[in-house]
Amino acid sequence: MNTKSPILILIAGASGSGKTTFANEIIARIPKNTTSVVICQDSYYISNSQLNKKERRLINYDHPSSFEWELMREQLSDIKKRKKIKVPIYDYKTEIRLDKTIDISDVDVIVLEGIYAIYDDVINQIADLKIFIETPKDECLIRRILRDVNERNRSFESVITQWRSTVSPMYDQFVEPSKKNANVSVLWNEHNRVALHLIHKWINNIH
């Protein structure tokens, strides 16, 4: 077993900014002999299975309080020590956490991506690199509409309503201010090969 501490990279930004794509691009450039994983912060949404579907639709999923922070901190701390963790699985269509989990252990590079990836002080302290993805809001909205309608069984009207009522306001109030915690801000309205190259070079230098 590799005893060297794994690299933890945090990627934050607005909903639809391209965090998942950027995370996957980073992982794709890592050498095959280096183990890696992308963890979506949405996995740590608080399970509201006790509520009916109508009640769950009233929850503000874009507020920091919608996440189970203690579990997130514990699991990221454990995986940094190469301990095995069981990451929850969140179902976007039913809006509840599933009973099954994903087992992750002994990886060299961990990427956590989510709107609040660099929001929490405890998680920031154990991270090796904190990235904020900057994408124009109108582009984020277009991407979110396409994703939620095609992949998450949402109507166009519901996506727009949620954007206006919670997504955009919570970005302005909580997500955008967390940018001050980032080591690097990346423009991602287009494919930023320079940023990817520099981050890949950084990973190779410290690993």
Swiss-Prot record:
GO biological process per UniProt: CTP salvage; UMP salvage
InterPro entries tied to this protein: P-loop_NTPase, PRK/URK, Uridine_kinase, Uridine_kinase-like
Keywords: ATP-binding, Cytoplasm, Kinase, Nucleotide-binding, Transferase
Enzyme Commission number(s) from the entry: 2.7.1.48
Gene Ontology MF terms: ATP binding; cytidine kinase activity; uridine kinase activity
Binding site residues for ATP: 13-20
EC category: transferase
Gene Ontology annotations for the cellular component aspect, listed alphabetically: cytoplasm
Predominant place of localization: cytoplasm
Pfam name, any one: PRK
HAMAP family, sorted: Uridine_kinase
Protein name: Uridine kinase
Lineage: Bacteria, Bacillati, Mycoplasmatota, Mycoplasmoidales, Mycoplasmoidaceae
